[in-house]
Amino acid sequence: MEVTCLLLLALIPFHCRGQGVYAPAQAQIVHAGQACVVKEDNISERVYTIRESDTLVLQCLVTGHPRPQVRWTKTAGSASDKFQETSVFNETLRIERIARTQGGRYYCKAENGVGVPAIKSIRVDVQYLDEPVLTVHQTVSDVRGNFYQEKTVFLRCTVSSNPPARFIWKRGSDTLSHSQDNGVDIYEPLYTQGETKVLKLKNLRPQDYASYTCQVSVRNVCGIPDKSITFQLTNTTAPPTLKLSVNETLVVNPGENVTVQCLLTGGDPLPQLHWSHGPGPLPLGALAQGGTLSIPSVQARDSGYYNCTATNNVGNPAKKTVNLLVRSLKNATFQITPDMIKESENIQLGQDLKLSCHVDAVPQEKVNYQWFKNGKPARTSKRLLVTRNDPELPAVTSSLELIDLHFSDYGTYLCVASFPGSPVPDLSVEVNISSETVPPTISVPKGRAVVTVREGSPAELQCEVRGKPRPPVLWSRVDKEAALLPSGLALEETPDGKLRVERVSREMSGTYRCQTARYNGFNVRAREAQVQLTVHFPPEVEPSSQDVRQALGRPVLLRCSLLRGSPQRIASAVWRFKGQLLPPPPVLPAAAAEGPDHAELRLDALTRDSSGNYECSVSNDVGSATCLFQVSAKAYSPEFYFDTPNPTRSHKLSKNYSYVLQWTQREPDAVDPVLNYRLSIRQLNQHNAMVKAIPVRRVEKGQLLEYTLTDLRVPHSYEIHLTPYTTFGAGDMASRVIHYTEPINSPSLSDNTCHFEDEKICGYTQDLTDNFDWTRQNALTQNPKRSPNTGPPTDISGTPEGYYMFIETSRPRELGDRARLVSPLYNASAKFYCVSFFYHMYGKHIGSLNLLVRSRNKGTLDTHAWSLSGNKGNVWQQAHVPINPSGPFQIIFEGVRGSGYLGDIAIDDVTLKKGECPRRQMDPNKVVVMPGSGAPRLSSLQLWGSMTIFLLALQR
């Protein structure tokens, strides 16, 4: 009994256990773009080298079931300064005109929810070579007690490149080398990484005055040509020198026209002049021509530093700077400071009092202040002092100090700021001192401590200030660190104490501080108050949309949960079915008392009539949000299996092919059992589709279903639609496009013949060591001027669309030239193999057709297995060649050119299979019809089912 059970368990197919054919994702990165070099010697460090501005194409080839989703990400490379990430959800990553900053490591992440994701990477190295920059530096040193001077010249050549460039120095047309003579030295400076080379000319001699060329090269990597730069060294070579037509600080009035000239006083070669402005660009309307800068009708915003720079690549650039100051007065403020020694915050007779006045002026130190009392100039005395630049106040501030305040000191004080002799208008500020002048207080109006508004509405926060004079109110956030006000400022001034917001958002909720300013009022400790802003916003729910599947007759529970909202509670929940209002479901008393955070609807048994769209509208008295449920007993979509090995079976003689379509059913137990599938097949660019019904038995999770599509035309592609059907009706459809691909010749498949219909020619490659290549063609692609009386008119099938491989022996081919076509590498798993193929050898100059076996067991060894020479007639003939490889091997078709141009040789329909060759030649005109499949096959299901019945009968 135990033995029988063990046998039964062993016969159960693997895919029927656990997850079936579900498999975790696997990935491999291949390149398909304009790569220069792809180094793959070290698998852990694959490097893809590409030239800048070329097109990068990387493909992530994935396997696994269900079909994995692919995501590309990138980390920084050598040419990038910081981490970067870009996500591309596609199996092919394509970057047009790649830049050097896009180099780095690219990761392909494939995941399908089974197991762990597969992650592969490749490093992209972007190659480039910029134009070199050559600068000249000179030093002069005294030698032997000032009897004569030695002049040394350094020619510094710098270039940005990847890989590091090689430098070649030339004097005229002669190449210079390190220590070529006592006057030449070539070296790399410290703290450089190969991007700089210096040519040092010591104790300059007459022959050193010449033309010098710095040539940089990356050794033609990626086809990047060399670049060079030339400099003519003479005895007059000198760095630039400058002088300005104005002083370095230029003060002007607004509205004036400003002209500054930057004059060259030296430099050979002739330097180039350039004007710049900091901060920002030159003002609008400014004109820089050579060394002349003109600014018409200058304004205060045009103030700043203007730089004139001269460069001629000799020495350091010469630079002169003009600080342009346009006179202006703005932002007049005052401060009332009670007696600081007595730490008083009020004005009291008998104590000191200070009045301060400040304006923002350009230039600040040139502003002049005047004080007036009751309209008359204030006269200084022992009790009235006027000071400037108080260290406790902003720079260039004027203060009027009243010592031992008397009643007679009460009055109106006026501070006037001006630029004497300038058309800039004066700026003044007035301060009233009396017994009613009191420090400020601040408070929040009654009922305004908490402001509640809806999101998107305007809001107004208010603080009331009392006192004389009333200072401005400053607003800031309290509860959030580094949080900004709605205006984007950290601190905002309001003259009336009201902070206004046009449209509030939920992020603006929180506590706001209002405080008195210490200017335009008393210079005392700031008074503060706080206002709470509460923003109500509609609820957010989950799921916003959910697909609910259940078998007919089973119960269904729908739940709509509140994620967030203000207020955070459900005030009401309304359910609708297909737009019709449903009676409210019962609510538990506990949930009603606490305020529920979700709404539920229960269906006792799902029926066709109760299938459809359900909506739950949740409200919190501010707004509402909706959960949408699509409830049905529809079957989920099939999951196509993309990892079928060699799904294409071609039948060359009938010009048809078949395709093995495989799939699994997603979550088959979630709904009623699948009864059958409806298959729709449509040839691309055609309108008519063929529909077939595919009956199935009980489908298990992970079970691989299979159906063979027959009578497909080579080389057309087809669109496939597959729909499952249950007792409920049609389920979700899955679609894909299948393409005809020539199967790769594999010895494990006896019916796998290479017909050369696909451009990939079954993985065959041209040998790089031969004289010329095999050519793939058919009757439609033949050269109309081809040589007559040689070569086949069509392939073995006799149709003009069929392809074959041949050698063209016309000029410039010569006697004995060889063309070799090499198969993929096969792993030997049998002792004997048979190579079958058709050949066509017609023409009076036919050479030889050889079949070789390349063994890769210990090294590489080519062995002749078959050979044929001479004219064999204008017919296709078949050959069967037995081979006995001792290890991994390849087969090679070698065509040898004969004595003339009438010697074209062709091959077609190559088959490699295990076992001995047939004793009788197959009729080449016989058409073999491959068997189609009219019903799906449940892989291995029928086999182990029959075996189980047999074992049970045996046990009895």
From Swiss-Prot:
Glycans are attached at residues 42, 235, 257, 307. Residues 934-956 form a propeptide. It comes from the Eukaryota. Residues 780-789 have a biased composition (Polar residues). GO terms for cellular component: axon; cell surface; dendrite; GABA-ergic synapse; glutamatergic synapse; Golgi apparatus; plasma membrane; postsynaptic density membrane. Residues 1-18 form the signal peptide. Its main location: membrane. InterPro entries: Cell_Adh-Cytoskel_Orgn, ConA-like_dom_sf, FN3_dom, FN3_sf, Ig-like_dom, Ig-like_dom_sf, Ig-like_fold, Ig_I-set. The keyword Translocase does not apply. Transmembrane segments: none annotated. Required for radial migration of cortical neurons in the superficial layer of the neocortex. Plays a role in the formation or maintenance of inhibitory synapses. May function by inhibiting the activity of NLGN2. Interacts heterophilically through its MAM domain with proteins in axon-rich regions and through its Ig-like domains with proteins in differentiating muscle. Interacts (through the Ig-like domains) with NLGN2. This is MAM domain-containing glycosylphosphatidylinositol anchor protein 1. The gene is Mdga1.
